[in-house]
Amino acid sequence: NISLERARTIKSTFMAEGALCAATLYVPQDARPDQELPAILMLGGWGSIQRAMTSSFTHSFVEAGFAVMEFDYPGWGDSGGFPRQGINPWRRTRVADTALAHLKSQSMVAAHQITLWGTSFGGGHVVDLATQHPELKGAIIQVPMLDGLAATLATPPARLLRLVSLGTLDQFKPGAQIYIPTLAPEGEFGTMDRDGAWDAMEVAMDALKGRGYDNRVAAKSVLTMPFYRPWLRLKHVKIPMLMIGATGDTVAPFVSDKVRRVGNPHVQVIEIDANHFDPYFDPLFPGVLAHQLKFLRR
């Protein structure tokens, strides 16, 4: 991951869903305090926290002259909220909506020039937010989780049975929450072990500079997955959207047939020969970034 040390950092907090959420706004080092910059709101994936997997993109966007905000969802990273490490996609979308309002309120941000950026699970949230905010300049989603049912069915049956069993137990059992690994080495138990997930996490740790990563997710979180299907709302997107799908993605299978069936003229689709985590790293990262910068400069 590329360093963010050349960007000016502005820390802040906002309240969402009863929790105090941590946010970081990155602006170009040479930006004036009275300058209003075009901005990007970054929405991370399933087990994401600030800087993990996103810092190379964030740095590049700041270098291109944008103000870029990352944030932690309630119960994750530097944000407050209990219980910890839970995921509910509908709640997360509401939190992201509040984060968007927070970004618009920042003095160095041009509120009428905001682009949403989402990766993996966050890509699904961007679809949902884009349908609610026709005033936004645009949206970018990469390796998006558009169909939770397809992602669920792509899980090996024995693994799926264990995930659902633990999720159900966590949902209904009184007492302490049950946690499962968010990421795991290939073949080991966790919510993500395919497509080089473990190796990607180890690389992402370098960007956290000793901050650490709590590699757990509440087991009941997996029960939401098959019911979360943002592709069904893709037809309602009315702002320019760049969608980069990976044809070899086995974590969040790219449902290109469903996207084509929707046929939304506002959505530009680029398919790349890659797995779920390839776009974050060389050799694919520069090409993926180039597509996104071209879209942002349109």
List each model region and its residues.
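Conserved alpha/beta-hydrolase
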Residues: 60-80
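Short beta-strand/loop motif that positions the catalytic acidic residue
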Residues: 237, 243-245
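Catalytic nucleophile-loop/oxyanion-hole region of alpha/beta-hydrolase
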Residues: 50, 76-111, 115, 281-288
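Short beta-strand element of the alpha/beta-hydrolase
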Residues: 34-45
